[in-house]
Amino acid sequence: MVSVKVFKPRSGQDAVRNKRWACSLSPRCASRLDVSANDHVRIEDGKKALCCRVREIHEKDKYPLRVSEKTRDNTGLEHHAEVSVRKQIPGKSYMKARRTGDLAETVWDDLKQSQILIYAPHGGDTEFGTDDAAIRLYRKLQNSGFDCSLWALHGFNPNSFARWHVSKPGLTLGCYPGLDQVSDRTYELVVSFHVQSKGYTGIGGAIDDSFRKCVVEEMDSRIRDRYEFRWRHNDMRWKGV
């Protein structure tokens, strides 16, 4: 952990300036934290915690931490605030995170199976219901005799989307201990749960069209009167690939 002051992005620092959940670190600060570009960092100002994606390592050590204006505005993090920064993002157990508005991590894994991974990176209040859906699927598969693992994050607090909805945790190394554990092997199938502000449910991903179509047909046969399901990538804004 390092203690630093928050600075604005410099002029022309497009990788950080207009992005949410974005920051950059000086070479010295990055070295002390042992982080690289695309890693995540946890920032605490004494009242709250939030997560940022390190978009780049900038040049001057005089400015150890630069945080985008969108991130500061959305989370109430002040320019020139004194903060502590660390590499490990999850802060507390699930129940304590829920009580205090923090972030927790869940991993259920036998350290060896490579058949199925269930993945919910924005659970809790961040994308409400996604971790619950992931856990239900995990238990259903386990009870049906399938080997599977689960990794999920649970962010809490009414402002959890602004504080914890950071993109691409899968590109990080050492930021989420549970994710590091399940990332040490290749799976036959990975199922990821997300929420979108659209009027349909998209079955996306890199798996072939016939598989996605089969999933949509099965879901449609069960609850066709309540939801619209789509499987063609061209019909979805977020394709998940």
Task: Label every PLM stretch briefly.
Residues 27-33, 44-46, 147:
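Serine-hydrolase catalytic machinery in alpha/beta-hydrolase-like enzymes
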Residues 27-28, 53-60, 64-241:
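N-terminal catalytic or cofactor-binding beta/alpha core of small enzyme domains
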